[in-house]
Structure formats: C-alpha cells, structure tokens
A protein has these predicted regions:
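Append "and occasionally in soluble cytosolic enzymes with long acidic Gly/Pro-rich linkers
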Residues: 228, 236, 310-407, 493, ...
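A structural "hinge/loop" feature
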Residues: 48-67, 90, 117, 139, ...
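Aromatic- and charge-enriched surface segment that lines or borders ligand/interaction sites
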Residues: 93-147, 178, 262-265, 308
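Detector for C-terminal structural segments
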Residues: 321-349, 393-402, 427-539
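Ligand-site clamp/hinge motif
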Residues: 235-281, 294
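N-terminal lobe/hinge region of extracytoplasmic solute-binding protein
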Residues: 47-98, 129, 222-223
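Surface-exposed binding/hinge segments that line
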Residues: 106, 139-204
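Gly/Pro-rich hinge or "lid" segments in bacterial periplasmic/extracellular proteins
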Residues: 174-176, 183-249, 257
Length: 539
C-alpha cells in the first residue's frame, strides 16, 4: 500500500503530534511556534521504511522486527557498541568443556522481565526449547514462507531433526544453563548475538501463540530490555522506556520523500534508508547523514524451477547483462561497491576461485543465443509499498536492471509485489510461481561467514529452486570444523560454487545510512543494526 502524506500525518496525530503541513502562507515563525503536547516532547520519533512484522524475533527474518526486538529484549550474549565483539548481556560468563561438546552459561542474578517473571535457568531452557521447535509452532507451509530461521542455521536443524547439533539444554542450577552438542558448534558465541536469540518471558507467550495461528502477530512479549512494547496496532509502533528515559515512536513510512518531509517538518527526529536521490537535499539542509559500514548484501535471486532459468547459459547471460558497477555508481551511496560473492570482505576475503561477471552486452547476447532463448517471458519481481535498509527505492533498482536485461535480449515482464504483512517475502519463499528473477537482500547480524551462506544456500528452497549436495555437505562440515584455516577454505569453496552455478547474483555491498535532525546530538549507528535507542542523545 502506498503511504501518502495524509497517512503519515494521521500516524503522527495518533501519537499526539501536531502535523505541520507546509502551505504557501506558512512561515518559519509558524513552524517554530507550533506547540507539541508535553507528553510527546520526550518521545523520540524514528522513520523506518517498513513496519515490523512481529514482536517475536525468532519467527521471522524481518529486519524491522529485529531492529525493535533489540530494544525490548536482551540476549545471553551481546555486541560491544564500539568494537562489535561479543560481550556479556544476560549471561555473565560462559565456559566450554575441553571437548567442546558442552557450554555452561552463568546468568545474571536479580533480573526481572517486564511482566514480573524472574530470569532463571529454567526460563532460558524454555526459550531454547521454543526456538528449537519453531518449525512445529509455524507449521511446514509458513516455515517455508519465512525462509530459514536462525536456530536452524546455527545448529543445523530443529530439535526434532537428525541434523540438529544441539541435543539437550538443562538447568544445572538456578542460574546456570548447560547446552550439550553432538559435535562442537563453531562461532556459537557470535551466533547467539543474533536478535532471534532474545530471551522473553514464557508467561507472555500464550496470547502471542494463539494469534500466531492467523499470521505473524504484533502481540507484545515481555523482555528485560530498556523498553517495553507500547501500541503496535497502527503504522506507528510505540516503545515505552522502563527507566525514565525517552519513549520512542517508530513510524513506518515506505516513501523516501515522505520520510524526508517528516524530518523537514520536525515530525521525525531520525529516518533510516537514505538514498542518493535525496542526499544533496539533506546536506544542503544541514542534516547529519550517518553511514553504517557495509555489512549487508543486495542480490538478484534466480528461480531455477523456471524452465528458462534452468539453463546455465541463461543465468550467465543475466550476470553479464547487469553492469553492476554503473548501478552502484548511480543508485547507491558512495562507498558501496559491487559484490562478486555473498560475504563482504570484512567477513571473508574473495578467493581467486570465485567467478566474476563483468558487464558485457555482446557476451550476454551470445550466451542467450547459445541457450536457444526465444523471447519467452521472464517475470522479474520487486517489492512495493516498502523499502529495506539494504534496498532503497526498489522501483528504480528494478528499472535499471530490467533495462539492462532488455538490452541484452530478455523479454522482461515486471511483477511488482506488495511488501505488506510480509507478502513479498512469503510469495518469493513460498508457493511455486512463474517468477524467474527477484530482488532481495540480507542484513548481516552474525560476524561469521558461515551464517549467510547456510541461511540462503545450505538447504533446498523455493526462493532459488536450487539443490547442490556438495554445498550442503561442505556447509554442514564447516559448522563443526575447528581448524579456522580449513573452515575458511571450505567457505571459499562454497562461494566459488555459487558463483559458478548462479542460484543468485550478488549485486552490491551497500552503504546504508540514516539522516538525523538538527536536535539530535548522538545516534548509536551499528552495521548489525544493534542501535540501542536508550543511548540516543538530544542537543
């Protein structure tokens, strides 16, 4: 659904914020004299490109859900705001056994959830059991529609599956939890920083689980973080401070220019997903543009279940037709760069074995001819009604890429699909269709190169219609490989295999950025989106 300025203003009014509508007669003094209710003065207002899909970060791969979950819940292991290294959060200490088959986590004492429940080892055990059985909670069809979830990625499968490396989670004492594995799980501590491993109160699950039968709900769960859920019913989600800090209102504003309008009229303090299209306006207005380090990937997915896309020459023609360097130069923020593999170099350096595809129109045309392509329609899907942090203005991205593909001889059929309620994600991941190509991407939360590759490519899925038994085997081995050099080589081999077989084409490692208003002194930017709102400072 397109969010008009009227919708934006209605959302602001629901917060008690006075809409500032620019007119020909409006003056600067009028704007400055606009009164705002005292209760709203302490509310920090953030514009984001889409609304969160759920209040439970364990049941979805949605970026906006995870962004807000970090404010309400805490993990056992956290991320240092300055270095990105792992730090104690709800677990004060952790110890592996000599053989790596057990992990003991010691919990903080005297921690209480927002609903009054005490943090104990039994509570943590219940959380692990919930994460490990989310496949049963969602059911097969919906599980397929949300993509591979973090518990399965980290442990190799769910608790009822043979591939799962986690065999038991027990409360060894009131504040010690012990995990037992069939083999040592590498990078486990880093993986537990993923927002999907947030600890919530089991006493708050019942209403959520009931609502889950009808879709991903926004029913509040109780955490231990600096915020609790406020109103989640509209396009604005409220976060209420638990320690007398500022409350936060997170407004879903899909349109880039409407987010800019919100900043200009002081209805927003910050907005995310800045695009080059408005960069000059931001700079000329004196706003601060806060850039994150590139730790996300935008890619073009290829559905090999589509009869035309089954031909490798066709997929190679797609790769050569794109001219990704020009796309980055014109549609991405400065500092973004072309991706030739899925992991950014800060996680995994590209090896010489990775096949690269330079823009080459003649090569693309010749490959199509060799494949016997005869103008069959190629459905190209892209999301509407929302943007992603890693994918601003998807319509423009689609137009550029579709133009390049058409020039190479493809018969491109545009297929805009609404993002609303996760429709785009569920349709791309779910039932078979005539989809040939689609735009998607990932924000990287776990600083381990295995994670992204395992999430996307370890298991056969309907997003790519691709199965590679060798890749599956190598990723499973890398999950438990203790020699870091050997493990790195394994993951380089997987990246090389993907570059040859082309289930998807990495487009760019984009610089993502926020814009902050004149009253913002400090905003805690983070490449993994661990941006703690309680640390925000006003001038």
């Amino acid at each position: 659904m397109h969010l008009s300025r009227r919708t934006l203003l209605a959302g602001l009014a629901s917060l008690g914020l006075a809409p500032l509508v620019p007119t020909a007669a409006a003056s600067q003094s009028t704007v400055q004299s606009q009164s705002v209710p005292e209760t709203a003065a302490r509310t920090f207002r953030i514009g984001v490109p889409a609304k969160a899909l759920s209040t439970d970060p364990a049941v979805t791969n949605d970026v906006e859900t995870h962004r807000l979950a970090r404010q309400v819940y805490q993990n056992l292991i956290g991320v240092d705001a300055e270095t990105g290294e792992t730090v104690a959060e709800l677990a004060t200490d952790w110890t592996f056994s000599d053989d790596g088959l057990q992990l003991a986590l010691e919990l903080k004492h005297d921690v209480t959830f927002h609903d009054g429940t005490k943090l104990t080892a039994d509570v943590v055990v219940e959380n692990f059991e919930r994460w490990g059985s989310v496949n049963e909670l969602l059911g097969e069809q919906r599980l397929r529609q949300v993509g591979r979830l973090p518990f399965s990625v980290v442990f190799g499968g769910y608790l009822d599956q043979e591939a799962c490396l986690l065999t038991s989670v027990v409360a060894s004492s009131e504040h010690i939890v012990t995990l037992t594995f069939t083999e040592p799980v590498q990078a486990l501590i880093r993986s537990l920083t993923h927002p999907a491993f947030a600890i919530s109160s089991p006493e708050s699950w019942a209403e959520f689980d009931t609502a889950l039968q009808d879709g991903l709900p926004l029913v509040p769960l109780a955490g231990t973080g600096p915020y609790r859920w406020g109103d989640t019913s509209g396009e604005t989600i409220g976060l209420e401070s638990t320690n007398d800090g500022h409350d936060v209102a997170v407004l879903a504003i899909p349109n880039l220019h409407e987010r800019l309008y919100g900043l200009d009229t002081q209805q927003l303090d910050v907005f995310d997903a800045v695009s080059p299209a408005i960069l000059r306006q931001l700079v000329q207005s004196g706003y601060q543009v806060l850039q994150r380090d590139p730790l996300a990937v935008l890619y073009l997915g290829i559905n090999q279940a589509h009869p035309v896309m089954q031909n490798l020459h066709v997929r190679q023609a797609v790769a050569h037709a794109l001219f990704r360097g020009e796309m980055v130069d014109t549609l991405q923020l400065a500092g973004s760069y072309v991706a030739h593999q899925f992991n950014p170099p800060s996680l995994l350096e590209r090896s010489e074995e990775v096949t690269t595809y330079s823009g080459d129109l003649n090569r693309a045309t010749n490959l199509l001819a060799a494949a016997g392509y005869d103008g069959e329609p190629i459905e190209f899907w892209y999301p509407t009604g929302a943007e992603r942090v890693y994918m601003t203005q998807p319509q423009k991205l689609f137009s550029y890429l579709a133009g390049r593909l058409t020039a190479a001889g493809f018969n491109i059929v545009a297929k805009p699909v609404s993002w609303d309620n996760g429709d785009y994600m569920s349709q791309v991941m779910g039932d078979p269709s005539d989809r040939a190509l689609h735009l998607f991407g990932r924000n990287v939360y776990v600083r381990d190169p295995l994670y992204l590759l395992a999430e996307l490519f370890e298991q056969p899925n309907r997003e790519f219609g691709w199965r590679n038994n060798a890749v599956t085997k190598v990723l499973a081995q890398a999950r438990v490989e203790e020699d870091s050099d050997v493990r790195t080589t394994m993951l380089e081999q997987v990246e090389a295999a993907i570059s040859l077989d082309l289930p998807a084409i990495p487009l760019t490692f984009p610089i993502t950025a926020l814009a902050s208003g004149h009253d913002v002194e400090f905003y805690p930017i983070s490449p993994v989106l661990d941006e703690q709102y309680e640390r925000i400072q006003r001038r």
